Amino acid sequence: MSQPSISKSMTIGESGLAVVFAATAFLCVIAAAKALDAPFAFHAALSAAASVAAVFCIVNRYFERPAALPPAEINGRPNYNMGPIKFSSFMAMFWGIAGFLVGLIIASQLAWPALNFDLPWISFGRLRPLHTSAVIFAFGGNVLIATSFYVVQKSCRVRLAGDLAPWFVVVGYNFFILVAGTGYLLGVTQSKEYAEPEWYADLWLTIVWVVYLLVFLATIIKRKEPHIFVANWFYLAFIVTIAVLHLGNNPALPVSAFGSKSYVAWGGIQDAMFQWWYGHNAVGFFLTAGFLAIMYYFIPKRAERPIYSYRLSIIHFWALIFLYIWAGPHHLHYTALPDWTQTLGMTFSIMLWMPSWGGMINGLMTLSGAWDKLRTDPVLRMLVVSVAFYGMSTFEGPMMSIKVVNSLSHYTDWTIGHVHSGALGWVGFVSFGALYCLVPWAWNRKGLYSLKLVNWHFWVATLGIVLYISAMWVSGILQGLMWRAYTSLGFLEYSFIETVEAMHPFYIIRAAGGGLFLIGALIMAYNLWMTVRVGEAEVQMPVALQPAE
């Protein structure tokens, strides 16, 4: 049966988008000419070039349009849209390696400050937000977008909603990362942790994120599967809540429409409260809810076992939604924040122990009857160890929110160790495991190029994590104890520089651990590249039709 022919004319969507990008390019050229500072001029010129490239791609798409529409099904299966997933998977590995490398550089700068080289562009103050944004938002964000687009298609048994919209999301999101990252190197920042991009980058992200939400929702609405799979609940919670947090924390008043500088709309303790309501829930919904969606899809899929308890996943979801959003004030213990607010944040943080560990138990117990696979499947082992790190981090976090513990841990390297046990152990490993699954699926390969390389990656990265977090735990507790030590006369027993000197060996160990983690990521990148290049294609068998009842 022949496929329906396509009219050799641009669609309304293509025409409209081409006009919008052409107008954007024109406005960006004007903005670059009238810019009040060099970074804004650079970003305006970069945006103009990107807009022109977008127009070219849309026009080229028109000229290279095939004679017929792509089939709705291939061998009885929906013809899924894998292009945006492949793009985001590639960008995840690119930004991941870049972010890990920058992390190694700044860890080395803390151990050997001369490595700053007195150059502003590579100083610790500019590279640190570049590292956090590259790892959290560039690496983690691309993993979440790629996996969410894959999971929502497969679990709903329909092609991703929209034609250009998914591509707009993945390319637009990575352009935001490029603007934000180059801005940090040029000294453009709002000085709000995890929310450093200036006003124009925030506006662009808002547009991209709204389209992301619409694509995801539209795919769910047109689903052929009556049930909405649990992973999609967590993805939707992540997308919606991050939108609310972004809009709440980032209102800013630009000094000029042609300058990069702006002032945050909030002030004083209100700004601090908004910032850590955002900052903590960026952890809660970007780095937790989104990656729990990965856990709930990829572990059962890899283990070939159903989720241990669907009822527990429902409890886990709703408890996480209602409790996490209130826990932000524990970042502001012993500050000008009202004491009742600090106590409220501490209370909700402690309550988070229960749903977090419920989710961990659900993930681990999914392997019931398949524990032997941990010996033979390093990808599944990586996914399961990530859940163990999730449990450890979600125990340590509530414990550190208790005021008496926080009085020792706050502002010390213990917090850095806690963050990285979650970031490297939980987010890193579950992302690696997901990409090891996703790349062969998206590129239609029978399997990975080498499971031995996955095994090497697992052990090298695990050793790196253990070195990193152990060094930070010891240095953080030592730091806190030295800061609070007094002589019999009531004077500080140690000067500040003495506490810094005591940290030096631990900073060297941290850099070594980060280096091992980077080596593991490079092994992974090679393995995935070879999987795509030389991996054996998987033959898709037709789906047998179910007999009518």
From Swiss-Prot:
Cofactor binding summary note: Binds 1 copper ion per subunit, denoted as copper B. Binds 2 heme b groups per subunit, denoted as high- and low-spin.
Q: Which residues bind heme b 2; high-spin?
A: H418
Transmembrane region(s): 12-32, 39-59, 87-107, 132-152, 168-188, 201-221, 228-248, 279-299, 312-332, 344-364, 382-402, 423-443, 458-478, 512-532
- Please state which protein family the record places this protein in: Belongs to the heme-copper respiratory oxidase family.
Q: What is the phylogenetic placement of the source species in the record?
A: Bacteria, Pseudomonadati, Pseudomonadota, Alphaproteobacteria, Hyphomicrobiales
User: Record's PANTHER family?
Assistant: CYTOCHROME C OXIDASE SUBUNIT 1 (PTHR10422), CYTOCHROME C OXIDASE SUBUNIT 1 HOMOLOG, BACTEROID (PTHR10422:SF29)
- Which controlled-vocabulary keywords does the entry list? Cell membrane, Copper, Electron transport, Heme, Iron, Membrane, Metal-binding, Respiratory chain, Translocase, Transmembrane, Transmembrane helix, Transport
Gene3D superfamilies named among the record's database cross-references: Cytochrome c oxidase-like, subunit I domain
**SUPFAM superfamilies in alphabetical order:** Cytochrome c oxidase subunit I-like
- CDD domains linked: cbb3_Oxidase_I
Induction (record text): By low oxygen levels.
Question: What is one GO biological process annotated to this record?
Answer: aerobic respiration
Q: In which pathway does it act?
A: Energy metabolism; oxidative phosphorylation
Where does the protein principally reside? membrane
Q: Which major enzyme category is it?
A: translocase
Anything else known:
This cytochrome oxidase is probably a cbb3-type.
According to the record, the signal peptide region is none
> NCBIfam families from the xrefs?
ccoN (TIGR00780)
Q: Quickly give the catalysed reaction.
A: 4 Fe(II)-[cytochrome c] + O2 + 8 H(+)(in) = 4 Fe(III)-[cytochrome c] + 2 H2O + 4 H(+)(out)
Q: Which organism is it from?
A: Bradyrhizobium diazoefficiens (strain JCM 10833 / BCRC 13528 / IAM 13628 / NBRC 14792 / USDA 110)
InterPro entries associated with the record: Cyt_c_oxase-like_su1_dom, Cyt_c_oxase-like_su1_sf, Cyt_C_Oxase_1, Cyt_c_Oxase_su1_BS, Cyt_c_oxidase_cbb3_su1
Q: What is this protein called?
A: Cytochrome c oxidase subunit 1 homolog, bacteroid
A Gene Ontology molecular function term of the record: cytochrome-c oxidase activity
What is the stated purpose of this protein? Cytochrome c oxidase is the component of the respiratory chain that catalyzes the reduction of oxygen to water. Subunits 1-3 form the functional core of the enzyme complex. Co I is the catalytic subunit of the enzyme. Electrons originating in cytochrome c or a quinol are transferred to the bimetallic center formed by a high-spin heme and copper B.
Q: How does it sit in the membrane?
A: Multi-pass membrane protein
